[in-house]
C-alpha cells in the first residue's frame, strides 16, 4: 500500500485525536528513524515535548538492536512511544523495556499503521498490506532521485 504525504498527514491527525481522547502524555518519544516522523507530527498536534531514541535492524527479519537509548528526561513523566508501523512488536517491546528502565510515570504506545498481531495502545490505520511510506519511496543514486529498487515491483504492480 503506497502512502502519499497528504494521506500520511491525515493518519497522523487521526492518531493524535485517538491519543488525546484517552491519554495525556507529557512527552512524545519517536523511535528513529521512521517513528520520528509521525512522532514529531503527533507531538506538535498535542503540543507536547518531543524526544527520540534509535533502534535498527541490521538485516530484514533480524531482531532490533538499540543504537541510542531514550533521554533521561522521560523519568517520572507520562510517555507516548511512537513508531510508524507495528507487526511483530519486536521494536516496540525493546523500546518499552529501554524506556521502562528510566522509571517513567506511565508509557503507552502508538503507531501510524498496525500491520500484524502485536497490538499497540493506539493505532490510526490497520492493514495486512506492506506499507510504502513517502520518505522510503525514493533514494539518491549519483545525482538523481530514483525509485528505490526493492520497491519498484510493488509500485509498478499496483498500477
What is the role of each PLM region?
Residues 34:
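Conserved glycine-rich SAM-binding loop
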Amino acid at each position: 500500500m503506497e502512502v502519499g504525504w497528504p494521506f500520511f498527514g491525515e493518519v497522523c491527525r487521526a492518531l493524535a485525536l485517538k491519543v488525546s481522547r484517552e491519554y495525556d502524555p507529557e512527552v512524545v518519544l519517536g523511535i528513529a528513524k521512521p517513528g520520528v516522523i509521525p512522532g514529531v507530527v503527533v507531538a506538535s498536534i498535542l503540543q507536547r515535548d518531543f524526544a527520540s531514541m534509535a533502534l535498527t535492524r541490521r538485516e530484514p527479519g533480524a531482531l532490533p538492536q538499540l543504537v541510542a537509548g531514550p533521554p533521561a528526561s522521560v523519568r517520572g513523566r507520562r510517555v507516548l512511544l511512537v513508531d510508524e508501523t507495528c507487526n511483530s512488536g519486536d521494536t516496540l517491546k525493546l523500546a518499552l523495556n529501554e524506556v521502562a528502565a528510566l522509571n517513567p510515570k506511565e508509557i503507552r504506545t502508538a503507531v501510524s499503521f498496525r500491520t500484524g498481531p502485536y497490538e499497540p495502545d493506539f493505532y490510526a490505520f490497520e492493514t495486512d498490506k506492506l506499507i510504502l511510506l513517502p520518505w522510503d519511496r525514493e533514494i539518491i543514486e549519483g545525482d538523481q532521485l530514483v525509485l528505490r529498487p526493492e520497491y519498484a515491483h510493488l509500485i509498478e504492480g499496483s498500477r
